[in-house]
Amino acid sequence: MSNYKYLFIFLVIAFSFEPAFGVSSFSADEKENIQIYEKSSRAVVNISNIAVNYDFFYRAMPAETGSGTGFIIDKSGIIVTNYHVVENASKLVVTLADNSQWPGKLVGADPNNDLAIVRIKAPADSYDILEFSHSNNIVVGQKVLALGNPFGLRQTLTTGIISALGRTIAAKNGRKIEGIIQTDAAINPGNSGGPLLDSEGKVIGINTAIIGSAGSVGIGFAVPSNTALRILPDLLKYGYVRRPWLGIEPIPTVYLRRIGIDVPDGLLIARVVKGASADQAGLRGASRTVKVGRYQVPWGGDIITHINKIPVTTMEDLAQQIETRKAGEEITIHYIRNDRVLSVTVELVLRPRS
């Protein structure tokens, strides 16, 4: 009988220590994942995009056209997400981690970088916030974590590494987004707008599901945090990004060479907008058109070859050199006019809102 008594005591002691043994069985990496999830998940929200259509009798017929993810960065209820998550919304509904729902107001949007800002008026104690880290410090191979709502499955965590840096993808409006982060962390439809976190739980990117919309194929993409940090002040203050421009209509000379015209690499200026940066700097557009085969080609304009000594041969090259700067900044443009290589300093001015 005493043997049964000792066995019972042993089993009680063993089971009483089981939770402790279970906790200690987590690896250091697993513990880090758990800590980051617990620290970050209350800052991640689901955003439902509601469109309102009307029937024959003009009765409103709201319908959810899609959903995505966002994350809160400020106790005033500021949410960062993708532009394509909120595009064309008649109504936005934001669901917090505690399942409470709040109307969202679109504060600002930048289709060119697929980013948008939404605000909610919810009690500050009903959510947490995330902090940004500078994406210029990240390296290929480092661990990353993605939080979001893939396929409507809320509060989902996936992990991976940074697979590559400096990728270029197309935004929904066709513009190229430069400097994209590539990761093997699973990013699926519904993850759009969610945070890509480093091992400290700080945001280094904004996940996007633009590419591979049919589902994850082991390649995910994120807009770098430095892009968001650069444009957020404008989105919050003006609702859009105030970008500088040259005020030219350029033609990549590669197209001219395809029809048999011998011209150097660069951008031929077809037209200069009066009063814009290029006009003020004295750059010239085409003075006439010439017929080449069945084509009418603008001719006689300056050919831009470099900006700040960096070759410029495509529209994407030009956008990268201009739109990442601020109005008032100066750039040096190298160009060819009448077979002479010249340069000029140009002060950038704001692109007109229209």
Where are these predicted regions, by residue range?
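Conserved PDZ fold ligand-binding element
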Residues: 79-80, 280-315
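Bacterial N-terminal signal peptides
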Residues: 8-19
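Nucleotide-binding motor/catalytic cores of P-loop/tubulin-like NTPases across gene-expression machines
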Residues: 273-276, 305
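Serine-dependent protease modules
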Residues: 22-265, 271-274, 315, 319, ...
